Amino acid sequence: MRLMSSFNAVAAAGLGLALQTSTAMAQALEIVGAPVPGGTEHQPAGTNLAAGLQWLDHMILVIIAAIVAFVCILLLFIIVRFNRKANPTPATFTHNTPLEIAWTLIPVLTLVVIGSFSLPELFLQQTIPTADITIKATGNQWYWSYEYPDVKTADGETLKFDAVRLEKEELAAAGYPADTYLLATDNAVVLPIGKTIVVQVTGADVIHAWAMPAFGVMQSGVPGRIGELWFKAEREGVYLGECTTLCGK
């Protein structure tokens, strides 16, 4: 997927030219989504949706790390303080009401805090706004077919094309580095930045999943059904997506 600052959504000829000159654009724009050796971080966020999800992920990671550290320290303290040698006479009480209240309320409050931040992100993703541009993505084994429903070609047909994976020996000629193998395609969706894009996802044969990690979006493509996602990209680039479902026979 290529995102550019200038784009004519109603000029089919312009879209055709953009698709035909994919090699030049691949060389001119930053490529986002290629594998990083030893990488453990998220891809650079290309949308506010992705930025929000990444912030939420980091926040929850901090909470989880704090819980794990607390449990480990508490376990170590109990092992040292209450082993048979240090505490030969065990306690005889059977319960501790304040402690039981605490270990009930603290997890509940923790979940409430996490939910108060995660639910707005969920609603933001699932509430589809009015689209500036709509595209349809149909999953096939093993490629994607795209349509621009609102864009017509010179002969009045809806603009559509297939995006087929490039083989290793084809990457250099198309302007892609070797590490984009299994991600780069011969044709790419071309869209503008700063516009609301709605993607309608379906499958032609089996269940697929259209995913763009840098945008923080993923939608299953089920044959006979239409699922929708949306995004508004904030930076130019060539973004590499993938199918995140084992879609084969």
What is the meaning of each model-derived region?
Residues M1-Q27:
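N-terminal secretory/membrane targeting signals
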Residues A12-G16, M59, V68-C72, V108-L111:
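Hydrophobic alpha-helical membrane-embedded or membrane-associated segments
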Residues Q20-T21, L75, S118:
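Hydrophobic membrane-targeting signal helices
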Residues Q27-M59, I79-K249:
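Non-transmembrane, membrane-proximal soluble domains of secreted or membrane proteins
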Residues I64:
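Active-site-proximal cofactor/substrate-binding loop regions of enzyme domains
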Residues V68-F82:
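Alpha-helical transmembrane segments
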